[in-house]
Amino acid sequence: MLINFVKMHGLGNDFMMVDNLAGDITFNAEQIANLANRHLGIGFDQLLLVETSNTKNVDFRYVIYNADGLEVEQCGNGARCFAFFVSKKGLSNNNPIVVETRSGIINLYLNDDNTVRVDMGKPSFNPADILLLVPQQSTYYQIEGFDLGAVSIGNPHCVMLVEDVNTVDVSSIALRIQQSELLPNQANIGFMQILNTHEINLRVYERGSGETLACGSGACAAVVYGVEQGLLKENVVAHLNGGDTLIEYIQGGHVFLSGPVQFVFEGKVEI
C-alpha cells in the first residue's frame, strides 16, 4: 500500500505525519521501526496519525507511536506539529484544535508567528499514574541509586537534577533507570540543569526512541517538578539541544508548552 506522509519537526524532535481520517491505514511495530530507521527508512522519533474521534466536541484523535513501534500516550512537540499539519492541510479551521490522546483531551492553539501553544493538562504526581511501584507518593524517589522526581504529563517522566547536562552520561544512566523493576512500563528520563528561576538546560532520554534533540512533555515535566520544589518560577525557558521552548505552569493548574514547528518534506512510501 502506498501512503502519503509529511516529515515535520519541533526543535529537532522529528515526526512522520500521516492523515488517516479515512481509517484505511494500519501499521505494525516492525513496519514502524523500519520506517523510523535513519539509514534505511524515513527516519523519525515518532509516527503521528491524524484520525477521526467519536468523542463529542473533539476535532481529531491524535495517535502516537515511538520509533520502536509501540503506541504511547502523549508527545508535546508532536502535538504542536499535529496542529500545524491539520491547519495547513485544510483539515480544520478551528483554533484551538481539540484532540484526543490515549491519556485525555488537549487543546492546541495556533499563533500568528507559526508557533503553537499546547495545553498539556494538569500534571499528576500519583505514582499509579506514572506506573511507579512505590508504597507512597513522595517528592523524590531513589531508583537504581539516583534521586529522581516523578511526574505524569499524560505519559511517565522521571527528572534528575544535575550540575551540568553536558557532562552527564545520559544514555547509560537513563537505560539503567528504565530497566528498574520499579518502572515496569519504563519512563522518559530528563536531566535538568537549573540556570536560574526562569531558565533550564535539559536533555531527555525517551523510552522507545533514545535521546532526542527535544522533548516537549519532558520539558513540561522538568519545569513542573522544579516549580513544585520551589526551584523555578511560573514561566521557564527550557534550552534543549534542538532549541528553546517556553513552559508555563502555576502550582495546581495546567501546564502549557509553546514553541515553533517546521515542515521538512513530504512524499509517498510503500508499507
UniProtKB/Swiss-Prot annotation:
SUPFAM superfamilies attached to this UniProt entry: Diaminopimelate epimerase-like
EC number per UniProt: 5.1.1.7
Keyword Transmembrane tagged: no
Task of the protein: Catalyzes the stereoinversion of LL-2,6-diaminopimelate (L,L-DAP) to meso-diaminopimelate (meso-DAP), a precursor of L-lysine and an essential component of the bacterial peptidoglycan.
Reactions that this protein is recorded to catalyse: (2S,6S)-2,6-diaminopimelate = meso-2,6-diaminopimelate
Stated name of the protein: Diaminopimelate epimerase
A single cellular component GO annotation: cytosol
Principal subcellular localization: cytoplasm
Record site: Important for dimerization: F265
GO molecular function, one term: diaminopimelate epimerase activity
Metabolic or biological pathway, per its Swiss-Prot or TrEMBL entry: Amino-acid biosynthesis; L-lysine biosynthesis via DAP pathway; DL-2,6-diaminopimelate from LL-2,6-diaminopimelate: step 1/1
InterPro entries tied to this protein: DAP_epimerase_DapF (IPR001653)
Location in the cell: Cytoplasm
Keywords recorded for this protein, A-Z: Amino-acid biosynthesis, Cytoplasm, Isomerase, Lysine biosynthesis
Self-association state and partner proteins as the record states: Homodimer.
